[in-house]
């Protein structure tokens, strides 16, 4: 099993290109199941989760070709051979559930295993299922699988009011609604850029959608969808992660393809901590102002609030801030599993339920640490960049699910980092 070796204590200077958004691409790929015409995605990230979704779609009979080194995906579902998404594939990634709505909407039936993925608290699929039930689907959970059937004549438009904001449930309902009979209104819908990106792609395919980016999305169902070519939106989580690298280490880095509107609430916290963020012609330039980073309080919220997927990385920054910071996690349970690993590096962190209290220290110390999930893995790498001595991060297979070429991108800016094959 591979690990990452980081030698800290140096400034970073240079440019880092930001990839297409993993979370957007994982929703866009199943959209091919809605049509028998080709869907081409450009600016696709090259990640293990994308390969898992490719494997899942191919198991259903879809064709997926990876072109231009993986940056272009050519998909076609003109002749599905199966409507069963097996546990052996689905268990690897929670986004696998996103094949349910499209298959049900287009062909009227689907069998999908309950998903796996990151071990972060309770992330139930109930919201997905209730949305599809509102459209008339008959659902039966047995033997670890969701058995779904559409009513005679197909799914029906409906009013779907989500009790809590859910990105995945919004995506599944949005895709299903494009082929439902009549009008579907999604209330308390997720507003993330990935939702907007999916809606734009579906509209290119012929869907009639209004209101994406707001809490209410209206979909007028159509009889069929066509093909399209669509660029995957910039990955705001990768963007925020690499913005923290010069914030933690010092120096100045330009993030190519970055846009303020993708990370507005995050930028506000960086500014309060003493980090400069400037727009450039090609992206964003980030530098730490003079002196030590200042403590700030952070509460994770659905977009446009502070993203939960940047909480672990932000904690790495605040471990060496002047003063005490309070981080409140309101999206997922049990999402401070990186805290004990950071304390091995000398961080002072107290966790009580969904709140972490971080008292900054002047320096972290390198240590052997273990990644517990995707975002925790990169937070430990960031901490290692600022620590004295060497840090070895094990179980980095988590990292490969969400970050492409992380060692290359950081070493190009002067970081001492390399992968140790397992």
From Swiss-Prot:
One of its GO terms (biological process) is UDP-N-acetylgalactosamine biosynthetic process. Phosphoenolpyruvate binds at residues 22-23. It is an enzyme of class 2 (transferase). UDP-N-acetyl-alpha-D-glucosamine binds at residues 94, 123-127, 309, 331. It holds the Pfam family EPSP_synthase. The keyword Magnesium does not apply. Keywords: Cell cycle, Cell division, Cell shape, Cell wall biogenesis/degradation, Cytoplasm, Peptidoglycan synthesis, Pyruvate, Transferase. Its EC number is 2.5.1.7. It is found in: Cytoplasm. NCBIfam families: murA (TIGR01072), PRK09369.1 (NF006873). Belongs to the EPSP synthase family. MurA subfamily. Cell wall formation. Adds enolpyruvyl to UDP-N-acetylglucosamine. This is UDP-N-acetylglucosamine 1-carboxyvinyltransferase. It comes from Cereibacter sphaeroides (strain ATCC 17025 / ATH 2.4.3).
